[in-house]
């Protein structure tokens, strides 16, 4: 899969990056390469009932939860909105949901406010967390390809996800809310 050009492309990828960064090619010591689909989202369908866009589920959840946090009125508590990376590969990276980032940050906030470690543990016990994601609905043209038990339908309300291995934070209380 060509990422920069075909075999006949002139120059190196790192030369182009170095020029853009204003450094020498040999000054690039390492890299992380992120590829993004830059196609704009589109609304389509006979009644414009469908939205197609890259990363739609993650961005939709991030946006709507941030809007909810901003709209909320809570002067007694510290409200936190966390958007993590690497959910598609198991969340086990240092910036993923299984990392210590949130725990460490909340502890530092508590300690910075002059609270004790016990106060931090109490605040965690009183906290309410939501893990937001989209559920993939049954494709109307290929219903046989869908999960035989869990069958979300388009525009039929929210889906509450459970996982036997507790990979979601759904429990009786969060499901009831």
What residue ranges belong to the model's regions?
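N-terminal hydrophobic/helix-forming segments and targeting peptides
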Residues: 1-177
